[in-house]
Amino acid sequence: MDRGRRVRISKLLSFGLRHDPAALGLVLDANGWVAVGDVLAGLVKHGEEVTRADLEEVVATSDKQRFALSEDKARIRANQGHSVDVDLGLAPSVPPELLFHGTSAKVEDAIRREGLRAGERTHVHLSADLDTAMIVARRRAGPHVILRVRARAMHDDGRPFFVSENGVWLTEHVPPEYVLPDEARSP
């Protein structure tokens, strides 16, 4: 592979693994690791057809050793330079079947298209019960909606969850297919 291609791939990897994982459709675990297959799929979405061998070459030849592969070469992460928080010191937790997200009804269409994104935060915040989700929703102006998230299914599909000390459930991103179609509304 030529140097220009290696640099392009390296820049995309840096962006996805250090700064904006969701842009490549990635969900980093607490320590910054993500499945190599997910990274390859994300690179394809950005016009870079990359094989495992290509990825291993970029990792091996990076002059700054920006990336690391796990011992079994199944996962990859950036070694440093994250603008996203990758280690909260929280152990991954198995969520309940459903979690809830309270928000403004005006963003519902976008959520149904794109899923729940963390925005400026490092994680999407979810509630374990409807009452708490409604309290969160009421912090926003206008009509509210409480979305139900198939959290256990997400977890079973390999998407990590954490629970903070104050009981808020955290995950990197909730893809739209995990947001149930029916919800509770309030004026």
Spans of model-derived segments:
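Eukaryotic, polar/proline-rich low-complexity intrinsically disordered regions
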Residues: M1-P187
